[in-house]
Amino acid sequence: MNSYDVVVVGGRVAGGSTALLLGRAGARVALVDRSRAGTDAVSTHALMRAGVLQLSRWGLLDRVVAAGTPAIRSTSFHYADGSTVRVAIRPTAGVDALYAPRRYLFDRLLVDAAAQAGVDVFTETAVTALRYDETGRVRGVRAMDRSGRTVELPASMTVGADGIRSTVAALIRAPVIRQGRFRSAVLYRYITGVLADGYQWAYGNGAGAGLIPTNDGQTCVFVSTTPERMRGLRRYGAEHAFTELLVQAAPTLRDPVVTATPAAPIRGWGGVPGYVRRCWGAGWALVGDAGYFKDPITTHGMTDAMRDAELFAEAMLDATAGLPEAVALARYQAIRDRLSSQLFAATEDVAAYDWTTDRVQTLLRRVSSAMGDEVEHLQALSDRRLTAPAWTS
């Protein structure tokens, strides 16, 4: 039975990034995911500057571009008063464009890079229990593969990077230290035949929308509102709800979207209120949505996941270099919470859908300021520690 330094549960953005960084640093890592490799996920796809910065530092941005992911060089904001504000993406922190890769491509890219770094990848394998030692410290996981065979994966550290419905967080009973009140109900679809000019975000009459250019010449379009309003509109069908919310969010976007060619059926998501969980303990940690989730209306989830993966990897390298593990992991949580606090609060207010134009513009400026702090922190991290072996067992 192989024993690992770290077992990472979850093979999406948070888990793939965590496994990749620790594998490159020289740790013995197992990555476990219940899904098949390369499966898609409901997502807004949009990476913000911090996420693109990390891809560049990790040497993966060229792969995203080579896959045909279009460069995003502007962002437009449409408001309920009929105004539109267009902002060019200025070259900053080595980033001159943003990207929104499809999840079947991006998640697979991260996991493949992790495997190239020496990570053992177990797909179609679901965690069923945690392993503990006599002191109560978590010591890996017990899982079941698709054939029903039990797989034992002992490890010094177990990471839950398995999303909103995290098995690891549930088994640990990780405490919630901050709870949101609001949630978006969202409809997503892909269309072709529309060349969106960069990211398009709309904040209209109690409804939001976004147009996000992605791979294969497609554009991801989402509309969102409160769950109560969505339920009322969906009584008349998903198409009716989609079009009505698009009109309420941004009337000028209606015609180009509804006359485009659908590339996939409409998919819905009922939403989950945001939360912040304690993200570490004896032998365990949480990364990404497993530990911290905010409403998707501000389209920052993938960037959150990559950021927290790197913060956690830095903490683990500090611990292997001699810093007490509890101190290193407490620092990880403190930095995560500092960088997330303003994003969480502003997103919570946007997800109430009770904004005026002036109010939502103020909230979006707060989001932008918090994203600037995030970029500044990531720029200060050392590339060397996460691109060359630095792990000491």
Predicted regions and their residues:
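N-terminal FAD cofactor-binding segment of flavoenzymes
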Residues: 42-80
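Glycine-rich FAD pyrophosphate-binding loop
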Residues: 9, 23-43
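Conserved Rossmann-like nucleotide-cofactor binding loop
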Residues: 14, 37, 165
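C-terminal helical "tail/cap" subdomain of flavin- and related membrane-associated enzymes
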Residues: 259, 314-393
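FAD/FMN-dependent oxidoreductases across multiple families
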Residues: 234-315, 319, 324-326
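Predominantly flavin-linked oxidoreductase catalytic cores and closely associated redox partners
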Residues: 113-252
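Beta1/beta-strand and adjacent pyrophosphate-binding region of the FAD-binding site
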Residues: 1-14
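Short beta-strand to alpha-helix junction loop
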Residues: 92-112, 189, 233-237
